[in-house]
């Protein structure tokens, strides 16, 4: 009886708004009734352990905003082979005091071409190469015991062309053809092409693919084997919601909703950031708050800062709990290569101007490339040529520019537009790989300093940090992908290599490269234990009076923590005279911010005395 009352109480809170939004979007009472039945069934199927977690999280809604949050992302197979073996590696994760683990897509996918798992064949089943649903459930249970929340991708925009819905559509089933955007001729597709940008103009040109089995054109925003779902069909929303609830009941606590700005299609638009996207995300948020309030939504929104606030919704009607901080990641790498933090500061100022409910997952590298989506209007105001700057950056991180320390590769280079993205691990892009090849210990020291500088700046930002697995031991590029015919065409595989367990053994040996990074990550965790990393802390940039130095300030009550980050290879002065008073370092040294001297690539953290 108590369980029924709990569900009824949560549902009553959202019933009117959920039903209003669903009917406004779909005008389909039958679909709404199916959705509400699925919600009740998912709640009833939820384990007592997970329901207890729901209660705990409801009592502490800011749990993911606390300073102890520290994340990592990885591919299951590259780290451990499969889910069972990954569970055996938990001591390594616990050693790092992780609280958040994002496993790259692990649901059933076609092989070998699956866009790194983002072409999903079955949203309810773990891919057999990685294990079973029981293995996933066992892993989430062990992670919870260790205080680690599991994040999985939920690919909302599309399915694999081999998904059972797509296979039924190919066989002529009109019901499932309506799950996608299918057209008999090019009339409507050509109208879409006039306004919809191409994601991969070179490797996957156009937004439509001819399906010979159906004799129809199907919308494929990304690759030809990824069919865009038709969210104008209420059955699609209901079925996808059913799947996310199923995964939540296996113990998944965070969902990274992939490519969410793309999910609604409308002729005459770019099919990006449309109002109906927010209706769908808001409905999904309410469903989760009713059935499994412990679960958090993390949006993947690769858009300008001005577009981001909408994806958080409002405090009264929230959508995503947090977003990937793509823009700052790009600007951190840009500042390092340019030795100029002005663009980074401007971008951070735009983020800091967002409402208080906006929260970010900060990172340097992940499974994807670095796309140089810098703010061209700000670049021009600063006297920077946007195109030349972009070309400089991707050539620099390719290692194909005089004086570059980096080793990487280009991704999706387009000679017609001069556009390209960058691939490589953090360590290799910071110069570790090149220094080791040359046997240059001075260059290696600088490379490690760059690596730690970026990580420290990233961990200081509003939100919480997420490491890319291997960064904690300075893992290098995996050039052997070029010998694999199934992987050679995608240069992102350069930074998708097997975890080097032999190198990991060196992490506790003083004087090793691995220990330098390992200890550096430990210092970040100590830094974030400060009360200035509480959810209600105020974060802002400050004028350092030196374009090569980024200044960040965290303040909570009477406590103030200042971070100064020298993005150059030279000693650099900074002056923050408006921040008066005496400051001290962690080891007790006194610093006066009116006149500070920083060493090359130094990250200086000082607390107001």
Where are these regions (language model features)?
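Active-site and adjacent substrate-binding regions of carbohydrate-active enzymes
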Residues: 1-579, 587-588, 592-609
């Amino acid at each position: 009886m108590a369980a029924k009352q709990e569900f009824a109480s949560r549902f009553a809170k959202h019933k009117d708004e959920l039903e209003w939004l669903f009917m406004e979007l779909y005008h389909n009472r039958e679909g709404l009734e199916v959705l509400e039945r699925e919600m009740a069934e998912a709640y009833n199927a939820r384990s007592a352990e997970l329901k207890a977690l729901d209660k705990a999280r409801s009592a502490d809604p800011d749990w993911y905003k606390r300073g102890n949050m520290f994340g990592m992302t990885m591919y299951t197979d590259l780290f451990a082979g499969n889910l069972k073996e990954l569970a055996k590696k938990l001591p390594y994760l616990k050693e790092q005091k992780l609280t958040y683990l994002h496993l790259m897509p692990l649901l059933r996918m076609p092989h070998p071409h699956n866009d790194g798992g983002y072409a999903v064949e079955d949203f309810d089943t773990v891919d057999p190469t990685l294990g079973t649903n029981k293995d996933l459930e066992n892993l989430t249970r062990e992670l919870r015991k260790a205080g680690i929340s599991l994040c999985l991708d939920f690919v909302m925009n599309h399915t694999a062309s081999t998904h059972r819905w797509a296979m039924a559509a190919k066989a002529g089933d009109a019901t499932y053809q309506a799950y996608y955007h299918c057209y008999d001729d090019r009339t409507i597709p050509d109208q879409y092409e006039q306004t919809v940008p191409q994601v991969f103009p070179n490797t996957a040109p156009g937004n439509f693919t001819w399906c010979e089995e159906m004799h129809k054109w199907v919308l494929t925003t990304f690759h030809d084997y990824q069919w865009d779902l038709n969210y104008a069909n209420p059955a699609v929303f209901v079925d996808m919601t059913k799947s996310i609830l199923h995964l939540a009941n296996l113990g998944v606590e965070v969902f990274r909703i992939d490519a969410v700005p793309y999910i609604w299609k409308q002729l005459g638009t770019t099919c990006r950031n449309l109002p109906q996207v927010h209706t769908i995300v808001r409905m999904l948020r309410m469903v989760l708050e009713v059935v499994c309030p412990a679960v958090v939504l993390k949006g993947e929104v690769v858009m300008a800062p001005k577009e981001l606030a909408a994806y958080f919704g409002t405090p009264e009607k929230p959508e995503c709990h947090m977003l990937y901080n793509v823009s700052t990641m790009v600007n951190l790498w840009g500042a390092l290569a340019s030795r100029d933090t002005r663009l980074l500061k401007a971008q951070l100022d735009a983020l800091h101007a967002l409402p208080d409910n906006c929260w970010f997952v900060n990172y340097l590298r992940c499974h994807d490339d670095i796309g140089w989506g810098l703010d061209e209007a700000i670049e021009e105001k600063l006297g920077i040529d946007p195109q030349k700057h972009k070309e400089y950056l991707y050539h620099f991180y390719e290692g194909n520019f005089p004086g570059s320390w980096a080793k990487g590769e280009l991704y999706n280079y387009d000679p017609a537009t001069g556009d390209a993205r960058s691939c490589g691990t953090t360590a290799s892009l910071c110069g570790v790989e090149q220094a080791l090849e040359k046997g240059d210990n001075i260059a290696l020291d600088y490379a490690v300093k760059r690596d730690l500088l970026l990580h420290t700046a990233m961990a200081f930002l509003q939100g919480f940090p997420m490491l890319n697995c291997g960064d904690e031991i300075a893992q290098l590029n995996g050039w052997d992908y070029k010998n694999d015919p199934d992987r050679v065409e995608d240069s992102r595989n350069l930074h998708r290599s097997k975890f080097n367990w032999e190198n990991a053994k060196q992490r506790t040996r003083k004087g090793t490269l691995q220990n330098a990074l390992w200890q550096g990550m430990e210092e970040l965790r100590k830094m974030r234990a400060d009360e200035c990393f509480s959810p209600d802390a105020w974060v802002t940039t400050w004028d350092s009076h030196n374009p090569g130095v980024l200044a960040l300030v965290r303040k909570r009550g009477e406590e103030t923590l200042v971070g100064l980050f020298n993005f150059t290879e030279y000693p650099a002065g900074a002056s923050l005279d408006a921040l008066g008073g005496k400051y001290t370092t962690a080891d007790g040294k006194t610093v006066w911010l009116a006149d500070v001297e920083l060493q090359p690539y130094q990250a200086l953290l000082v607390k107001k005395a």
